[in-house]
Curated annotation (Swiss-Prot):
GO molecular function annotation: ATP binding; GTPase activity; metal ion binding; mRNA 5'-cap (guanine-N7-)-methyltransferase activity; RNA-directed RNA polymerase activity
Full protein name: RNA-directed RNA polymerase L
Keyword Nucleotide-binding part of the UniProt annotation: yes
Cofactor(s) essential for the protein: Mg(2+)
Subunit structure: Interacts with the phosphoprotein (via C-terminus); the association of P and L forms the polymerase complex.
Gene name, Swiss-Prot/TrEMBL: L
Catalytic site: H1263 (nucleophile), K1673 (for mrna (nucleoside-2'-o-)-methyltransferase activity), D1779 (for mrna (nucleoside-2'-o-)-methyltransferase activity), K1817 (for mrna (nucleoside-2'-o-)-methyltransferase activity), E1848 (for mrna (nucleoside-2'-o-)-methyltransferase activity)
Function as written in the Swiss-Prot or TrEMBL entry: Responsible for RNA synthesis (replicase and transcriptase), cap addition, and cap methylation. Also performs the polyadenylation of subgenomic mRNAs by a stuttering mechanism at a slipery stop site present at the end of viral genes. The template is composed of the viral RNA tightly encapsidated by the nucleoprotein (N). The viral polymerase binds to the genomic RNA at two different sites in the 3' leader promoter thereby initiating either genome replication or mRNA transcription.
GO cellular component: host cell cytoplasm; virion component
Lineage, top ranks: Viruses, Riboviria, Orthornavirae, Negarnaviricota, Haploviricotina
Catalytic activity of the protein: RNA(n) + a ribonucleoside 5'-triphosphate = RNA(n+1) + diphosphate; GTP + H2O = GDP + phosphate + H(+); a 5'-end triphospho-adenylyl-adenylyl-cytidylyl-adenosine in mRNA + GDP + H(+) = a 5'-end (5'-triphosphoguanosine)-adenylyl-adenylyl-cytidylyl-adenosine in mRNA + diphosphate; a 5'-end (5'-triphosphoguanosine)-adenylyl-adenylyl-cytidylyl-adenosine in mRNA + 2 S-adenosyl-L-methionine = a 5'-end (N(7)-methyl 5'-triphosphoguanosine)-(2'-O-methyladenylyl)-adenylyl-cytidylyl-adenosine in mRNA + 2 S-adenosyl-L-homocysteine + H(+)
Record note on cofactor: For RNA-directed RNA polymerase activity. Mn(2+) can stimulate de novo initiation but it is inefficient at supporting elongation of de novo initiated RNA.
Length: 2005
């Protein structure tokens, strides 16, 4: 903050007020002043600095002249010294470093023992610890030298800080090694005695160098530790394996490069990022993707190199530096080459290394940013002539308008109001009336042009009054135009300007002098809340002469041409208003903009996105088109500056219409060109020539006018939304699917499009050409609206996600943890900050090394290294309180030593460093934090930590462990503990500090600042901070028990803002130190308070240990362990003083779970299993969705009133009042209290508010939030990293817990269980080198202690409410007026339809039809999902079923299906045609079959959950035998066909209008009833939840009604006689080849006849089977029956079996055999024996169907497949049958080799010697091939039923001397012989159901028998169908259904007619050939049908030919 009052106006503010920036002009000013000559550049700054320097610089000059007398020193710029400063270490601190690492290892080993004890990993005696791999004796010098450098410089800076605390503005002078430093906070001098050079710089430059040394030390230390660990045991260290010596070499090369290239050298460093990116692309992508990018990049580097020298010479001309040498081009090129080579060696083709190196450029220091030059670059960019294309702008506007329409339809179920409907065509008016919009596929660019003409009416209002939300925007503001000179030091200004300024300053009001938004209001005594609205409505902002724009550099920005614009307060508030309106009203319609997501959400989105675009999940659609995908990451050059009024206004005008304003959203474009832009860097004043008015000063570098473009920080949101709309246009024009995430100019775009792969185009080429084409399209689209893509930062890839510096490839994230710990070090915040905060920061930053299973050990060692350094070394040198801190620490350690009876001091320290900070120890990271990130109860966690620690700590005396807990429980009641409501989110990173004290300091600061405010508003509000909590306490003081949360709820429902936020706004940043410097609010007293706070913290442990009462009994378990949960509860209750209080204590997973490594599924615990079979799981993706139970969300039910009307504050206020009503339900006086609060905060009575409140909250709610208030002694907090929150509805553990806790919500215990389990797996894997297959976490019941919510007694004192809410007026949310309320709740009478049905509505749910309502709501919910899925295939695919499992457990299945069917027909009903027509109904149901399978997966997942299954089996027992979604789909569709229509509830909106109008019309036709329309006000999902809640309350128990009917065995498994089923299979014909030719050219016995057939005729006799029909071409009994007789196996092993048809045939041939089944689990294929189940009725003969196995374990080419083959069945593999389709020949041999390995090594199989057989499918190749070693082929079978043109045969293999497989010619000739000689035989029996299923799947609605009439009916249907233009998803790609259907259907019908008309013939290839030759449309047939459809077609053809008479 820059105070402007005259007394201190010349306060020296260093450039460090822009964090981390090294200012060029300041450096120039310092040097020029000290030398008396121009230093870095000859410009106005150096001139002014020489003529009239500022006082501080003069003081520095005097010091400099007295200290340094030498004359012949060479002057250089700071960067030239970098290399020398970095290498300057005169003392070697190696011993200190060794000592620190050794101690760190000792401390870590104790923590490691704790972890191993908890995880039950016993270490053997000869292997003491993995920590021994880090050997202190051989620390490499690339680690130690950086430590020494940092240590010395840090010591110097600390010394300077101590001086400065004592006496502000001191200067210190000291020599380190060969360099002499003169340091002061306003400038430094460095002189090298070695090279005789001298340089001048800002204090920030020295700090930057210190930080760089620290970063390099941290990085190198990490690399060394990690490599030492990995070398000895892979997986102990980090994933990346950088080489330390090389990293060091890189530092040195770059330092020396910068040292010769000066400041200009940083332009090269900036390009390193791109170079590393090109390395990354080289690893992850195919060549064509990466080379283009790499070449662009290298060209860019060379260009930069060529320019450097010229730039430098130009800059230094006329300065001291002019004579210095500048290296030639070749020298620099060589150095640069060296640096790039080193980077390349470091990356070493490893993606983790590359990701890690991405942090690299922050380790090289920072350039000086030249402010004026940056500003000139901005000016240049704005003057570029733009050529815009009108058509493109119009399309852009149309797309933007469409987005808004979609947004309104989705949120408000209506279009926005439109002024000029007549511009729309009939088609759009139809959408308008139907309240819907077309899907992406139906749009064309014409639509956008048409929509661009639409004008909206006002929909949103501008807030009437300014409220604090608007004000609390921490944006700096510029001084107004006449005070602009306050920015520069007065000495720099000419006298006349100085005098005039003093006068202006004196006359202007206080508020104009400030530079912070908040103070702008605080100091305004005429402030009126209605002013802003007037200012905006009258459009005064457009002609405001006072407007000025001052530009400042962005913090830490490397490039030139990015500046940050500031405006005066008055204009700034208009901008804040515009941004706020956008964020609230328009941004929600653009989900792609990332501005609205938090980090965790963002990370989740990225995970989903990279998952979707992973190369592994590519697939073809139903047309067999390959879906090409690519991702494009673009960066637009000068994004903000490229916008002009023309490009902003196309969309801004639309937003203006919606808000009823004029030019509010692009007003800056209208005013800025007329204002002056000025560079307001303190040390860069303009040349004034004595002119005061800046509008009259002539243009120069750093001051210009007529700025045309946009500027950073203007309307980022609007521009991002324009970019989204532009991509919409591109997507529609090119017919591709675009998924984008945008953040301003940074865009990550995924494109996908189905393409045909033709000759010579493989998948990579298809992806590449799509990427390049789309990149061009995007580039051109941007070009048309005046933007240019940056070449070096735009890249295309197949499968690399890159957003905000996080790299994900193949769906795996590369976290680069070293980047996160570069800044770890002592005093990580600031001087005054608590040592405790510093420790917390070290703790949480080092934890980054553990996330995602990186490395526990590296994190431990690094963390303890710095913590030990901080506590034991740095604490002595604390500038304010070093001695006191150290004394206090020694005292604490002495007491600890005595208490535990420890002999050695080092052991005491080891113990203390592992005691959690909550108890006054030195460990900020409690044990649980390495395993889960959030906890409901910190106290229990700390107790658990102590209990584990004392258990493993062997150095303490007997009994001291118990004594410790007794001491803990005998702590005095805390006299000062009051109910403090913490000001911060309890989950924030870093500690709460002492909650009480912090809020005291904050309150003191805020109150004093606020109460000084002359503005009445703020004055009154200030009282709130001093009194509010006490007052709120009084309202509820008579209510017992006091529930800590109750107070908080009260506190939130009264209109308060949190003090913390205001403090930050005033002081500008969170640190107390800044409060000290920048506000007068804190004085010496506060400093003392802060110091005593630190001392209190350090003495906490000694206070705990000082009292120990022996008579306390500790709660213990049977085995003597402590029950931590109870200890913590007792402690919590005792530490409150004189209040009856309910402390909610939750168990800690560390103590309440026993970890067992076992694979027994009977254990009653939570099972975590490994999801891959590799030895380690590092860097692998886990399962895509959690695999235990379903996730639960807090669901609040809010009526569907028009929420758009409410402001954000009003919504929050309603929620808070809802909470209050919920918590205190039934307490006396509650109604009156609520009434007063409602009137005070919302302005309407409770009665009116009631309908708006959320309907319910879960029991969880109290528990969840109660922990946010806790006693003063125990503040703590953890970073939220991953929260998982599961219901264990279905696991056995649920029973155990329900028995104990009843219906109480036990979620709390488990919200971290999964997260913890996964981390445990990862840690066990790191420590032992292999990860357990499975672990079970078994809850220990006595450790789990859950309290019921309390019952409150007593009554409220509501008299205070009025006072509190009137004190708070500025903070109160907007009032609601009755008109608004009426709009929201009253049904509107307008537009009453004449139709009788519309007027008669009644509620669907009337109190007695609970189950029916639930079933109906759920059915409608699923139908809704269907329509959503068909409309937009969006990236953020939701897991729709989640959270609905419990609801389904209560449904009436009959009603469910009926409503589902009815709703479906209404949603998809006919356009034209009679809806009651049977065909129409069939048509809709058949459409359902074609819906994308992801819907069926979700649906089946929910319905097949055990508890839902139990319920549905009351209606249909068959559900018990269903497995997998395919079977479920058929079963469900059968039910739909036969069910009746039912009444459907329809949702109405706030105006009580029906939402789905068109659907209701069809519904009324359908039912033709006179009963009224049944409606519901809630949306379907909310309704379902609410009713489930009611049902549960009614029956008050969770369990689902038990089965009332007993099942007969026949019902569960209908008896099917296998021998009868045998008749469904045709007889097979085959030829056995015994001794075949091995010469490939053999022509022996070739037949001359060659059939030319195109269709797969081999399926002609397979019409009895639906999913697969292998059993029709091959039979075990026919082929190898004799062998089977000899072997007599009891079990057949089928692998690679698909739908199990061959297995079904074998089951019919051998009725007594059992089966083991395996089939590759692939998303697109069957991995369940559906066909087997269909033929044989049930599955009880399949012993092991492979349930629950992962994909790898079902793949016969993977070793694990064979390892797990005996997991259930323990019989030998006597005969294994393999029908797998292998991609290539190698896979076949892989499978054979693995089979051989298995049968030769397996215990079970080896007992049979070599008598084991494998009967497998093989595709013969051109030449004959040898089998793998020791595998022999006995016979080959060629089947008549194989594809004629293929080379498929079946080979029988056994163990023995290896021989050859048959070759292609051999098999081919045998096939032709079979084809010529044999007819296909027909099965004896026809199964009508199967034939019908085949017909239906070929052509929906096709019925048997197929005759002339049936085909005519189908043709008639086609004409009806063509009205449908909806979009379906077919095989993953979206098509317009009507076109797709008519093409396919007409083709099929024509062929069937041809078959009808053809004669009956023998089924052989002669006849088939004749059929094909007589059919004219063969080409069309083959083009329009995919291979699967052709097979179905032939099956149906076979059935027709067979049934001919």
């Amino acid at each position: 903050m820059d105070p402007l009052n005259e007394g201190v106006v010349n306060v020296y503010l260093t450039d460090s007020y822009l964090k981390g920036v090294i200012s060029f002009s300041e450096t120039n000013a310092i040097g020029s002043c000290l030398l008396g000559k121009h230093y870095l550049k000859k410009d106005n700054t150096s001139k002014v600095a020489i003529e009239s320097p500022v006082v501080e610089h003069i003081r520095l000059r005097n010091a400099f002249q007295t200290r340094i007398k030498e004359k012949n020193l060479r002057v250089v710029e700071p960067v030239n010294m970098q290399s020398e400063v970095m290498r300057n270490s005169y003392t070697c601190e190696l011993n200190l470093l060794k000592q620190l690492i050794t101690r760190s290892k000792d401390i870590s080993s104790l923590k490691l023992d704790m972890i191993c004890d908890w995880l039950q990993l016993k270490s053997t005696s000869e292997n003491p610890s993995v920590l021994k791999f880090v050997d202190v004796r051989c620390i490499p010098d690339w680690v130690s030298t950086w430590f020494s450098s940092w240590y010395n410089l840090n010591k110097l800076i600390l010394e300077f800080r101590r001086e400065e605390v004592a006496c502000t503005g001191s200067i210190i002078c000291k020599t380190i090694g060969s360099i002499m430093f003169i340091i002061s906070s306003f400038g430094c001098v460095i002189k090298s005695n070695k090279s005789k050079r001298i340089s001048f710089m800002t204090y920030n430059q020295v700090l930057t160098w210190k930080d760089v040394m620290l970063s390099r030390f941290n990085a190198n230390l990490c690399v060394w530790i990690s490599n030492s660990l990995n070398k000895n045991q892979e997986g102990l260290g980090l994933r990346s394996n950088l080489q330390g010596a090389l990293v060091n070499k890189l530092y040195e090369i770059v330092d020396s490069m910068l040292s010769v290239c000066s400041n200009e050298g940083f332009t090269l460093v900036k390009e390193f990022e791109g170079f590393i990116m090109s390395e990354i692309l080289k690893i992850t992508e195919h060549a064509q993707f990466s080379t283009r990018f790499r070449n662009t990049l290298l060209n860019g580097l060379v260009d930069q190199l060529a320019k450097m020298r010229g730039l430098n010479r130009k800059r230094v001309s006329g300065t001291v530096l002019e004579g210095n040498q500048y290296p030639m081009y070749e020298t620099t090129l060589a150095t640069l080459g060296g640096a790039l080579k080193t980077i390349r060696l470091l990356v070493n083709k490893n993606l983790d290394n590359a990701a890690e190196l991405y942090y690299i450029f922050r380790i090289f220091g920072h350039p000086m940013v030249e402010e004026r030059e940056a500003m000139d670059a901005v000016r240049l960019n704005n003057e570029i002539t733009k050529i815009l294309k009108l058509e493109s702008l119009t399309e852009l506007r149309g797309a933007f308008i469409l987005r808004i329409i979609k947004g309104f339809v989705d949120t408000n179920k209506r279009w926005p109001k439109i002024k000029n409907l007549k511009v729309l065509s009939r088609r759009w008016i139809m959408y308008f009336k139907a309240k819907s919009y077309p899907s992406q596929l139906e749009l064309s660019s014409q639509d956008f042009l048409e929509l661009a003409g639409v004008q909206f009416e006002q929909e949103f209002a501008i807030p009437e009054r300014t409220n604090l939300e608007m004000v609390l925007n921490d944006k700096a503001i510029s001084p107004p135009k006449n005070l602009i000179w306050s920015v520069f030091p007065k000495n720099y200004l000419p006298t006349n300007i100085r005098e005039r300024f003093t006068e202006e300053m004196f006359n202007s009001s206080e508020k104009l002098k400030t530079r912070r938004v908040l103070e702008y209001y605080l100091k305004d005594n005429k402030f009126d809340q209605n002013d802003l609205k007037k200012y905006v409505v009258r459009q005064e902002y457009l002609g405001d002469k006072e407007h000025v724009v001052s530009l400042t550099g962005k913090e830490r920005e490397l490039s030139v041409g990015r500046m940050f614009a500031m405006q005066p307060g008055k204009q700034r508030q208009v901008q804040i208003l515009a941004e706020k309106l956008l964020a609230d009203n328009i941004v929600p319609f653009f989900p792609e903009t990332l501005t609205k997501y938090g980090d965790l959400e963002l990370q989740r989105i990225m995970e989903i996105k990279s998952e979707l675009s992973s190369v592994k999940s590519r697939r073809n659609d139903s047309y067999n088109n390959y879906i090409a995908r690519a991702s494009i990451v673009t960066d637009l050059s000068k994004f903000n500056q490229a916008f002009r009024y023309e490009t902003s206004s196309v969309c801004a005008d639309v937003v203006d219409e919606l808000h009823g304003t004029q030019s509010l959203f692009c007003w800056l474009h209208l005013t800025v060109p007329l204002t002056t832009m000025i560079c307001t860097y303190r040390h860069a004043p303009p040349e004034t020539e004595g002119v005061y008015d800046i509008d009259k000063i002539k243009e120069q570098s750093g001051l210009y006018r007529f700025h045309m473009g946009g500027i950073e920080g203007w309307c980022q949101k609007l521009w991002t939304m324009e970019a989204v709309s532009l991509l919409d246009v591109v997507s529609v024009k090119n017919r591709v699917q675009l998924t984008s995430l945008l953040n301003g100019d940074n865009q990550s775009i995924d494109v996908s499009k189905p393409v045909r792969l033709s000759q010579g185009v493989d998948e990579v080429k298809a992806d590449y050409s799509l990427a390049v084409k789309m990149l061009k399209e995007i580039r051109n689209a941007y070009k048309d609206i005046g933007h240019k893509l940056k070449e070096g930062e735009t890249y295309i890839s197949r499968d690399l996600q890159f957003m905000s510096k996080v790299i994900q490839s193949e769906g795996v994230m590369h976290p680069s943890p070293i980047k996160k710990i570069l800044r770890v070090g002592p005093w990580i915040n600031t001087i005054l900050d608590d040592i405790k905060t510093s420790a917390e920061s070290i703790g949480s930053l080092c934890q980054e090394l553990e996330f995602r299973g990186e490395s526990l050990l590296v994190s431990l060692i690094l963390r303890n290294f710095w913590l030990y350094e901080l506590w034991m070394h740095e604490s002595k040198s604390h500038p304010l309180a070093g001695k006191q801190l150290y004394r206090q620490l020694s005292k604490t350690l002495a007491i600890t030593q005595k208490f535990f009876g420890i002999t050695k001091e080092t052991d005491v320290v080891n113990l203390w460093m592992n005691v959690p900070m909550q108890f006054g120890g030195g460990d900020p990271v409690v044990l649980y934090r390495s395993f889960y990130r959030r906890t409901p109860d910190f106290l229990t966690e700390a107790v658990s930590h102590m209990s584990v620690l004392l258990k493993v700590y062997g150095k303490a005396k007997e009994g001291s462990k118990k004594d410790f807990f007794k001491a803990l429980l005998s702590v005095d009641k805390n006299k000062r503990a009051t109910l403090t409501t913490l000001m911060r989110d309890p989950q924030a990173v870093g500690s709460e500090r002492q909650a009480r004290v912090t809020s005291e300091i904050n309150r003191a600061a805020v109150t004093s600042v606020l109460s000084l405010s002359p503005n009445q508003l703020f004055c009154d509000s200030a009282i709130h901070y001093s009194r509010n909590e006490e007052e709120v306490g009084l309202i509820a003081q008579n209510i017992t028990p006091v529930y800590p949360h109750g107070l908080r709820v009260l506190y939130e429902s009264l209109p308060f803002h949190k003090a913390e936020k205001v403090v930050n706004m005033i002081s500008g940043t969170k640190s107390i130190t800044n409060l000290l410097q920048r506000t007068s609010a804190i004085n010496g007293e506060d400093i003392d308070r802060a110091v005593s706070m630190m001392l209190e913290n350090l003495g906490l442990l000694s206070r705990i240990l000082s009292v120990c009462q022996d008579d306390i009994t500790l709660p213990t378990k049977a085995n003597g362990d402590l029950i931590c949960c109870q200890v913590s509860r007792t402690l919590r209750e005792r530490s409150w003083d004189n209040m009856e209080i309910v402390g909610v204590t939750s168990p800690s997973i560390v103590t309440c779970m026993n970890i067992v490594y076992s694979s027994s599924s009977q254990l009653k615990g939570i099972t975590i299993e490994k999801f891959s079979t590799d030895k380690t799981t590092r860097g692998q993706r886990g399962p895509k969705s959690p695999w235990v139970g379903s996730s639960t969300q807090e669901k609040k039910l809010v009526p569907v009133y028009n929420r758009q009307i409410l402001s954000k504050q009003q919504k929050e206020q309603l929620e808070a009042i809802g909470k209050l009503r919920w918590v205190y339900k039934g307490t006396q006086g509650l109604r009156r209290l609520l009434d007063k609060i409602c009137i005070g905060s919302l302005g309407i009575s409770y009665k009116n508010v009631k309908p708006l409140l959320p309907r319910f909250m879960s029991v969880n709610f109290l528990h969840r939030l109660s922990v946010s208030s806790r006693p003063m002694e125990f503040p703590a907090s953890v970073p939220a990293y991953r929260t998982t929150n599961y219901h264990f509805d279905t696991s056995p553990v649920n029973q155990t817990l329900s028995e104990r806790f009843g219906n109480e919500d036990i979620n709390l215990v488990f919200q971290n269980a999964i997260s913890c389990g996964i981390s445990v797996m990862s840690v066990v894997e790191q420590l032992t080198g292999r990860s357990p297959k499975q672990l079970v976490m078994i809850p220990q019941l006595e450790e789990i202690d859950i309290m019921p919510p309390p019952v409150f007694l007593g009554k409220f004192d509501y008299k205070l409410v009025e006072k509190i809410s009137s004190d708070q007026h500025i903070f109160s949310p907007d009032k609601l007026d009755l008109v608004t309320l009426g709009k929201m709740l009253m049904p509107s009478t307008s537009g009453a339809k004449s139709d009788q049905f519309w007027n008669r509505k009644e509620n669907f749910f009337h109190g007695n039809n609970l189950v029916e309502s639930l079933s109906a709501a759920l059915a409608c919910h699923w139908c809704g999902i269907l329509t959503e899925q068909c409309n937009e295939n969006n990236i953020f695919r939701r897991e729709w079923g989640d959270g609905f499992v419990t609801d389904h457990a209560f449904i009436d299945f009959k009603t469910f299906v009926g409503v589902f069917k009815t709703k479906l027909l209404c949603g998809w009903g006919s356009r034209g045609g009679d809806i009651k027509d049977r065909d129409m109904i069939d048509e809709s149901i058949d459409k359902l079959i074609r819906v994308d399978n992801s819907f069926w997966r979700m649906f089946s997942k929910v319905i097949l959950e055990p508890k839902v299954r139990k319920r549905v089996m009351l209606f249909d027992v068959k559900i018990l035998s269903l497995v997998g979604y395919a079977g479920f789909k058929n079963w469900f569709i059968d039910h739909l066909r036969s069910s009746d229509l039912c009444e459907v509830p329809w949702v109405v909106n706030a105006d009580s209008e029906i939402v789905e109008v068109s659907a209701v019309k069809i519904y009324l036709q359908l039912l033709r009833v006179s009963s009224p329309l049944r409606i519901t006000v809630l949306n379907y999902s909310d309704m379902a939840h609410a009713i489930t809640r009611l049902i549960r309350r009614k029956s008050m128990h969770d369990n689902v009604p038990s089965i009332s009917r007993t099942l007969s065995p026949a019902e569960l498994a209908p008896v099917v006689e296998p021998t009868v089923q045998m008749n469904l299979f045709p007889k097979i014909t085959f030829e056995r080849l015994k001794n075949y030719e091995t010469v490939s050219g053999s022509t022996r016995g070739k037949l001359t006849r060659n059939y030319m057939v195109m269709l797969p005729w081999q399926h002609i006799n397979r019409f009895n089977f639906v999913f697969s029909s292998t059993g029709c071409k091959i039979s075990v009994k026919a082929c190898i029956g004799r062998l089977i007789q000899d072997l007599n196996p009891t079990v057949f092993y089928f692998v690679g079996e698909g739908a199990g048809n061959w297995m079904a045939r074998t089951a019919c041939e051998y009725p007594n055999a059992k089966f083991v089944y395996r089939s590759l689990k692939d998303d697109l294929d069957h991995h369940f024996p559906l066909e087997f189940q269909r033929v044989l009725g049930n599955m009880n003969r399949v012993i092991d169907g492979g349930e629950g196995l992962s994909m790898d374990t079902t793949d016969a080419t993977q070793k694990t497949h064979w390892d797990l083959i005996h997991r259930i069945c323990k019989d030998a593999l006597l005969i294994t049958l393999c029908d797998a389709e292998f991609k290539d020949r190698d896979d076949f041999f892989k499978m054979v080799t693995l089979w051989r390995k298995h049968v030769l090594s397996c215990r079970i199989c080896t007992t049979y010697g070599t008598d084991l057989y494998l009967f497998a499918k093989y595709h013969a190749k051109e030449q004959s091939i040898k089998l793998p070693y020791f595998v022999r082929s006995i016979a080959t079978y060629v089947m008549q039923g194989s594809k004629l043109s293929g080379s498929e045969c079946y080979v029988l293999l056994t163990l023995g001397h290896h021989n050859n497989l048959p070759c292609h010619g051999e098999v081919q000739s045998s096939k032709l012989k079979l084809a010529v000689c044999n007819d296909f035989s027909i099965p004896r029996k026809v199964e009508v159901k199967a034939v019908e299923a085949n017909c239906k799947s070929l052509l929906s609605g096709l019925r048997t028998p197929i005759n002339r009439a049936e085909l005519d009916r189908q043709k008639k249907m086609l004409t009806l169908r063509s009205y449908h233009s909806s979009v379906a998803t077919v095989g993953g790609s979206r098509v317009i259904e009507s076109k797709w259907l008519s093409k396919k259907a007409t083709t099929i019908i024509e062929w069937l007619e041809h078959i009808l008309n053809s004669p009956k013939g023998e089924l052989n290839y002669d006849f088939f050939e004749a059929l094909e030759n007589t059919y004219p449309n063969m080409v069309k047939l083959l083009d329009n049908l995919g291979s699967a459809e052709l097979k179905k077609l032939i099956k149906v053809t076979g059935y027709m030919l067979m049934s001919k008479k």
